[in-house]
Regions:
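Short cysteine-rich clusters marking metal-coordination/redox-active sites
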Residues: 1, 16-19
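Cys/His-rich microdomains that often coordinate metals
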Residues: 2-5, 22-23
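Charged, low-complexity helical/coil segments in non-catalytic cytosolic or luminal regions
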Residues: 8, 29-223, 244, 274-275
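Surface loops and adjacent helix of pleckstrin homology
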Residues: 10, 28, 238-240
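Residues immediately within or flanking Cys/His clusters that coordinate Zn2+
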Residues: 13
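Short Cys/His-rich micro-motifs in 6-15 aa windows
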Residues: 20-28
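Extended hydrophobic
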Residues: 206-257
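Juxtamembrane boundary at the C-terminal end of a transmembrane helix
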Residues: 262-276
Length: 276
């Protein structure tokens, strides 16, 4: 078991403790655990650190010494995902309100029924209980045109994890179904939904390994985890807030608003005092 900070992974690619070279434990990727595809890393370790630094600097109120790279642990990891293809379809009942065109003091309420369908292809969802689903979702999208047929050579130098959530497990399918049915609902309904009868069917489920740089740092006794898309560089993770910066911003904002109000008022008083 290896990991980044407290982030533990069931590895199928690991490292020699003596020379640091990569060693692939092939038997862990046999049978149903053998991926269909792999998406290779295109973002280097240094690039990932640059993405992390920019992510911190672009955010407001982050303590200046939080993103000191001396405190960062980083590891390139192939995360197990499944790509789901299929169709969502069904019927929705909705209603929306609109100000009456004949009497602006009245509200017209419209009810209606809509039916529709939507095909979807290669919707990603991680299949690891150890990975935070929201964090993995937040670093999408990935370019699936760059997928390669799985080969152990791509794992060299990286950690990798085999899936521990069944690709057709009911909760996993519901997660994807909810996502697609929400998209269909947005396409069909204006206003609120009063009832819905939607369902999703799956025509293909592909097992792939996705490139993610996992970063971990400790700050004031708390551990912070970040993920960098190993293909695009998209970076996400929770950032701490420096109280001093927040209060400084509040002070400057208060002074600015006060100046906007007080200065015109001052000149108005001067002008009124000069009126005979």
């Amino acid at each position: 078991m290896f990991g980044v900070g407290g982030f533990r992974l069931s590895t199928v690619a690991t490292f020699c403790a003596y020379c640091g070279s990569a060693d692939i434990i092939k038997e862990r990727l046999e049978g149903k655990f053998r991926p269909d595809y792999v998406l290779p890393f295109t973002i280097s370790k240094d690039d990932a650190l640059d993405c992390y630094t920019k992510h911190c600097k672009d955010a407001c109120f982050v303590p200046g010494h939080f993103f000191d790279l001396k405190n960062i642990k980083i590891q390139g990891t192939y995360v197990p995902f499944c790509l789901y293809s299929g169709r969502s379809e069904g019927t929705l009942k909705g209603q929306f309100e609109q100000t009456s065109s004949t009497n602006r003091d009245m509200i017209d309420v419209y009810s209606y029924v809509r039916s529709g369908k939507m095909d979807f292809a290669r919707i990603p969802a991680d299949v690891s209980v150890k990975m935070d689903n929201a964090l993995m979702d937040s670093i999408e999208p990935f370019d699936f045109n760059q997928l390669k047929e799985f080969n152990y050579a791509y794992l060299s130098g990286f950690l990798a994890e085999k899936y521990d959530v069944e690709r057709d497990e009911s909760g996993q399918l519901k997660r994807v179904s909810d996502r697609m049915e929400s998209s269909l609902q947005q396409e069909l309904i204006k206003g609120s939904v009063s009832s819905s009868d939607l369902k999703s069917t799956f025509s293909a489920i592909e097992y792939v390994l996705m490139p993610v740089w996992m970063l971990c740092t400790e700050f004031e006794g708390k551990e912070y985890i970040f993920a960098v898309n190993g293909q695009s560089g998209t970076t996400e993770g929770f950032l701490p807030c420096a109280a001093s910066k927040k209060w400084l911003w509040f002070f400057i904002l208060t002074i600015s608003i006060s100046a906007v109000i007080i200065i015109p008022l001052y000149f108005l008083i001067i002008w009124l005092s000069n009126i005979d």
